């Protein structure tokens, strides 16, 4: 038996959700005598060369693996000192029953579900918005929102060598005339609910920090300049030239846990690369199908059906072979690995350290895949669900729209 909670996360201040790019580190010998770099320092330097910069920008949403880590830590920190004390596990067996033996990991060709103890599954993270009435669920809009994607005879994707782009157009807002879409113009990032359409700037406000690192003697270090772009959630949006609408925003997700597991109603939790703090509230709710949270999608459909990603998704290339056409984007995916022996969650060197996963790429939420037949849609849905380990923590969620 299990039960479902709605968890809301309200930022206490600005937040920073770490991405693929991190700040550089200085590996120069601090001693006067030079020495060779250790193997661990060489590995970190290699990582810096590929993924470091003096300018870093937060992701807009927390990674699902970070939310899972937050929940696992929340259960541990509320388990009592016999199991968890001074941020260290005291009883490995007790901890295993609560949170499982390992954090999220992907093994080669193994996408079966993992054991996370009392935690059964997570939904994708989404936004909730409130003006004067009830809270409204807000999701990233499909990339083809307000676009007409028309497949005419002879314009269907048969294979990669014979592929043709369908006719894509949109209605001009001012006069309603149909205009051919030019991909050079790009696609605006939109968010929508059943009653709202929001631009990115209506939700997220940049908070930029620029500085120079200095050593303990007050001297500027080499490569010390940095620029960090964090975000805040807005408290209003502009609806006309001189008119604003007040609103409240928060992150949210559904979590299914064992029936004997009780989440705290309120807590302060940390998420992200800078341990950004959030006010967590949990509420017991009735379980619903994943796509029932997603707003209704309207508009004409010029093929048998399409699949819209509600969350980022891991999709094998072979599973895209029957797709007529797609409007999509990808994002790097990397996560931190730990187990019950991990003692230091802030270092990547030494004993009992955190480990970085290999980099993979996910198709981003909002991506749209078009199909000619219902059989092709069913096969694609099956492929998404087959990655049950990812689905378990909020990836590979989708909404299917058919004629």
Language-model features, listed with the residues they occupy:
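Conserved active-site/ligand-binding neighborhood in enzyme cores
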Residues: 1-403
């Amino acid at each position: 038996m299990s039960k479902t909670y709605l968890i809301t996360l309200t930022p206490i201040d600005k937040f920073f959700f770490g991405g693929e790019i991190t700040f550089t580190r200085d590996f120069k010998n601090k001693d006067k005598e030079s020495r060779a770099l250790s193997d661990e320092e060489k590995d970190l330097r290699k990582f810096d060369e590929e993924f470091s910069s003096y300018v870093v920008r937060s992701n807009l949403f927390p990674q699902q693996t970070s939310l899972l880590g937050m929940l696992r830590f929340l259960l541990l920190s509320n388990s009592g000192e016999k199991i968890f004390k001074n941020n260290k596990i005291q009883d490995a067996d007790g901890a295993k029953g609560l949170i499982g033996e390992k954090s999220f990991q992907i093994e080669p060709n193994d996408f079966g579900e993992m054991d996370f103890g009392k935690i059964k599954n997570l939904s994708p993270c989404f936004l909730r918005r409130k003006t004067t009435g009830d809270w409204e669920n807000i999701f990233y809009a499909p990339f083809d929102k307000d676009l007409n994607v028309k497949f005419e005879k002879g314009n269907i994707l048969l294979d990669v060598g014979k592929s043709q782009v369908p006719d894509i157009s949109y209605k001009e807002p001012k006069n309603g005339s149909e205009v051919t879409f030019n991909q050079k113009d790009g696609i605006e990032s939109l968010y929508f609910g059943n009653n709202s359409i929001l631009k990115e700037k209506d939700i997220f406000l940049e908070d930029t920090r620029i500085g120079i690192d200095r050593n303990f003697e007050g001297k500027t270090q080499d490569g010390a300049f940095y620029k960090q772009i964090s975000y805040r959630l807005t408290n209003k949006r502009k609806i006309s030239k001189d008119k604003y609408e007040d609103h409240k925003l928060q992150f949210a997700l559904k979590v299914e846990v064992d029936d004997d597991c009780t989440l705290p109603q309120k807590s302060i939790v940390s998420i992200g690369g800078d341990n950004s703090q959030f006010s967590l509230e949990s509420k017991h709710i009735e379980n619903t199908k994943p796509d029932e949270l997603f707003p209704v999608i309207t508009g004409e459909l010029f093929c048998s059906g399409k699949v819209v990603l509600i969350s980022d998704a891991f999709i094998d290339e072979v599973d895209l072979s029957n797709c007529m056409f797609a409007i999509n984007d990808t994002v790097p995916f990397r996560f931190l690995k730990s187990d019950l022996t991990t003692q230091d969650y802030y270092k990547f060197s030494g004993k009992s350290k955190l480990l970085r996963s290999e980099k993979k790429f996910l198709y981003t939420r909002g991506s749209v895949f078009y199909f000619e037949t219902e059989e092709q849609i069913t096969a694609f849905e099956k492929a998404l669900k087959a990655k049950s380990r990812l689905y378990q923590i909020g990836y590979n969620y989708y909404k299917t729209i058919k004629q």
